Amino acid sequence: MFLKFLEKIGRKKVVLDRGPSHPKYHEAKPWMNRYYVLLRHRPKWFPFNILIHEMLADDHGDGVHNHTFPYITIILRGGYWETLSTGKFWRPPGYIGFRSANNLHRVDLKPGTKPLTLFISGPFGLRKGPRSEYGIDFKSKKN
């Protein structure tokens, strides 16, 4: 019911699995429903935001990604597999993850599930490395 309310007041965004600059953007499909609990358009100077993510598909391709900010994620429903440099881990409902902006990771879903997470993003500009990497060998990389 809360998500329907957020959608009704314009706080829902369907995020595609690739952006307009991707060479195969014409093949893009919905990857996540993002609900803005706090700010729909957060200014870069504002220190945090609160969102709800309803995941619809695995992370795109074979690579890993990071974020432009540190964040906290709390799994509310479902769960997912998260690949980090230290291995692949099942994240069940109730899991709380604290991540730096430079933490490379990948999220994969159990077939037929739509995990729901509370996502609290921290301040922008704290990432030191590139946004994402493909075909990464975690044995030679450090987070």
Regions found by a protein language model. Name each.
Residues 1-49:
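A short, N-terminal "cap"/entry segment at the start of jelly-roll beta-barrel domains
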Residues 43-46, 71, 83, 93, ...:
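Beta-sandwich/jelly-roll carbohydrate-recognition scaffolds of carbohydrate-active enzymes
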Residues 49-67, 101-102:
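Conserved short histidine dyad/triad with adjacent acidic residue
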Residues 57-58, 80-81, 103-105, 122-126:
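Short, solvent-exposed loop/turn segments at secondary-structure junctions
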Residues 66-81:
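Short, conserved beta-strand element in jelly-roll/cupin
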Residues 83-106:
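Short acidic-glycine-tyrosine-enriched beta hairpin
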Residues 98, 112-129:
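A short hydrophobic beta-strand segment most commonly corresponding to one strand
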Residues 125-143:
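Active-site or metal-binding loop neighborhoods of secreted/extracellular toxin and effector enzymes
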